[in-house]
């Protein structure tokens, strides 16, 4: 059978919060079967746990934020994208601050951490959510859709009228049965416009943002000396974000997601619309891994 997965070992990292600019201590820990991904604010007394579920999303302005009462965890999407890409079902994410560290602005460092900790299969069936019919949400000219698909596919289109984007690929469609999340998506960094960063900083946001953890674009060009990691890094980062946002369903998806100018808010609206329409999806497991439309990298020993 396709089994649930957790981490083999505990692993720690330190980074800065994108918005606070302050140091954050991150610890990833194994968790029992059926726990899911749980964010844990260990700087609070008592400690507060917030499960990574669509219904716990409270803010979506600049990132996806989980909220429980007056406690929050910002910027969960890149870490969740890494968890989804490596098929991690159960883990505790301990944080010393209200924000996941931004690292280099991609999911790459989180993939490295998880692979360094090692993957541990557990004695329980992995559950998938299979899309049975189309579910769509729209807002102005933005659109997000789930469609049936025998596998996991993410298609995205961005539309920026800006010199850096003109003539550059603004669409991408990735079928993960034939494309590696780790190689082709995980290293795509978040991006921002210099004018927006200046505005955000004046409101005490993006205080930790820099060319070390984002692609920064001015009126005419990319300011990062090393340029882009992928020719289509901008749209691939939107795919990375979407994968993280979709993992708030609590299970891996069998289906296709299509986004046109979608962001964290619309992605979350789509999840909630899907969960409300119980005839649009079903939970499935696979006793025979060969019959499954999705496969994951084999667990590797911790190094």
Curated annotation (Swiss-Prot):
Pathway where this protein functions: Glycolipid biosynthesis; lipid IV(A) biosynthesis; lipid IV(A) from (3R)-3-hydroxytetradecanoyl-[acyl-carrier-protein] and UDP-N-acetyl-alpha-D-glucosamine: step 2/6
UniProt KW keywords: Hydrolase, Lipid A biosynthesis, Lipid biosynthesis, Lipid metabolism, Metal-binding, Zinc
InterPro entries named among the record's database cross-references: Ribosomal_Su5_D2-typ_SF, UDP-acyl_GlcNac_deAcase, UDP-acyl_GlcNac_deAcase_C, UDP-acyl_N-AcGlcN_deAcase_N
Highest taxon, organism lineage: Bacteria
This protein's GO CC annotations: membrane
Gene Ontology BP, a term: lipid A biosynthetic process
Broad EC category: hydrolase
Molecular function as annotated in GO: metal ion binding; UDP-3-O-acyl-N-acetylglucosamine deacetylase activity
List of catalytic residues: 264 (proton donor)
Protein family according to the UniProt entry: Belongs to the LpxC family.
Name of the protein: UDP-3-O-acyl-N-acetylglucosamine deacetylase
Organism, scientific name: Azotobacter vinelandii (strain DJ / ATCC BAA-1303)
The encoding gene: lpxC
